[in-house]
A protein has these predicted regions:
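Short cysteine-rich clusters marking metal-coordination/redox-active sites
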Residues: 171-175
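Short, hydrophobic beta-strand segments
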Residues: 2-9, 72-84
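Short, solvent-exposed beta-alpha or beta-beta edge segments that form flexible loop/patches at the rim
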Residues: 46-70
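Short metal-binding segments enriched for Cys and/or His
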Residues: 198-215
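Short, non-transmembrane amphipathic alpha-helical segments
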Residues: 21-33, 92-112
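Short, flexible, mixed-charge glycine/proline-rich loop motifs
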Residues: 157-168, 188-189
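Short linker/helix segments within small regulatory modules
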Residues: 184-193
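Short, low-complexity, polybasic intrinsically disordered segments
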Residues: 60-67, 130-153
Length: 215
């Protein structure tokens, strides 16, 4: 589960702009390159929420209120399981800044300033294991991946591999295509070599098949 909070000066974003920006931010964070199985991505989107805030006061470091006539400042705070933070930070900062820039361009403001000046701050905050709850109980990062992928495992197992590039396989947990030549995240089960996009998918698969992990 990921929560994206957007802080913007009052009046900068109208209702339609807030809705469009929220959709943009979710699409930007989920991405399209190297995507997991579509159904898994839909589950991830369903667990992603965007909240837009308009603070009553906005003071900058030079101790003056933000002037409504100035180009608007933004703060985006992304809360995600701590185990995901390091891997997702660079991607999130780049993509979310771009989503804001597209919104600025639509409003007739200079989108390039968001990369040239510190007008868009992005914080990726890792939530400690056991500190995120859903369905009335704590949910760790492994629990969330399990929740998002479990309903789709049978469909992932039936995905055709006929058109895959040589040396690649489909991650049996999330459906991502994995290059066996560039990863050591593999497991052999019943004579079949499986590859995984990250260690958590590998851990889930190993636990479900009773395979001990030595590394």
């Amino acid at each position: 589960m990921i929560v994206i909070e957007v802080f913007a000066p009052a009046g900068v974003l109208g209702p339609a702009q807030r809705q469009r920006l929220g959709e943009r931010l979710i699409d930007a964070l989920m991405g399209t390159e190297d995507a997991h199985a579509e159904a898994v991505m839909d589950s991830a989107r369903a667990l992603t929420q965007v909240l837009v805030h308009e603070p009553a006061a906005w003071i900058t470091g030079d101790r003056r209120p933000v002037d409504p006539a100035d180009p608007p400042r933004y703060l985006i705070r992304v809360g995600a399981p701590a185990a995901w933070r390091k891997e997702m930070s660079a991607h999130a900062i780049d993509r979310l800044t771009q989503a804001l820039a597209e919104t600025e361009a639509e409003a007739g403001r200079d989108p390039d300033r968001l990369r040239d000046q510190p007008h868009a701050l992005v914080q990726v905050v890792g939530i400690a294991e056991g500190s995120l709850g859903m369905c009335g109980r704590p949910m760790g990062s492994l629990d969330l991946i399990q929740h998002m992928t479990a309903p789709h495992r049978d469909a992932i197992a039936r995905l055709s591999t006929a058109d895959l590039p040589p040396g690649t396989v489909i991650d049996p947990v999330c459906g991502m295509t994995v290059d066996l030549g560039t990863t050591d995240l593999t497991l052999e089960v019943d004579g079949t070599l499986h590859g995984f996009c990250n260690g958590q998918c590998r851990r889930i698969f190993a636990d479900e098949h009773g395979v001990p992990l030595t590394a």
